[in-house]
Amino acid sequence: MKRIVAAVLAVVMLVALSGCISTDNNIDRYGADVVKHGAMAFMPTLDSLGAYTDVDYFIRMDEGVFPSYSMRLIVSYGEAEFKAEVKRLETAYTYLQEPQTADYSDEAYYTMPLTEFSAAGFDFRVAVFEDTVYPKNFGMVGISQAMHKIAYLWFYSPDHDYICEADEDKAAQMTEFLNYHFEMDKLG
C-alpha cells in the first residue's frame, strides 16, 4: 500500500513540476491574449498594422512551476505596404543598443546576448519598452525582406534569469531560444 501511495505521489509531483504547456493560434483571441498576459506595451493591435495581406498568430503558455508566455505575430504585406511598415518601425520602437549582462555566483551571463541577429529568414532587433527586464519581459521585431513579412515576438517569464553563458555562441543561443519559445523553426 505504501508503494502505491508513494508511486501516486511521485506521479503527481512529476506532473506538477513539469507543468502544462499549451499553444494556440486563433487570431480571434489575439487582442484578449495581449491584454491577459500584459503584452500591451510591445505587441501591436491588429488595427495598427496597416494593409496586411495575411497574419499568423501563435502563443505558447507554460503554466508550470516556472511559467513563461511567448507570443508571435507574423504579418505579411505587399511590396509597397511592406516598405512603408519597415520605415514606420524605425521610429515605432526604441531598440537595444548594447548586449545586457549579469553576474551570478562569479559567473558571467548574458541576459540579452545580442541586440541584432538573423534567424528563420528574419533580421531581428531587440526592442526596449516600459516594462523591459531582460530576459524576463522583452520583445523583438524581425523583418524578412525576401518574404515581405514582419515578426513581432514577445516573451515573459518571471523566473528566466539569462539566455546564455558568456562563453557560449550568442547567435546559436538566440536561435535556440527562438525555436524553443516561438517555434520559429517550424514556420512553413
Identify the meaning behind each predicted range.
Residues 15-19:
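C-terminal motif of bacterial Sec signal peptides marking the signal peptidase cleavage site
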Residues 89, 93-188:
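Extracytoplasmic electrostatic interaction patches
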Residues 1-4:
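Positively charged n-region of N-terminal signal peptides that target proteins for export
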Residues 11-12:
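Repetitive helical segments and hydrophobic/amphipathic motifs
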Residues 20-88:
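N-terminal export/targeting and maturation segments
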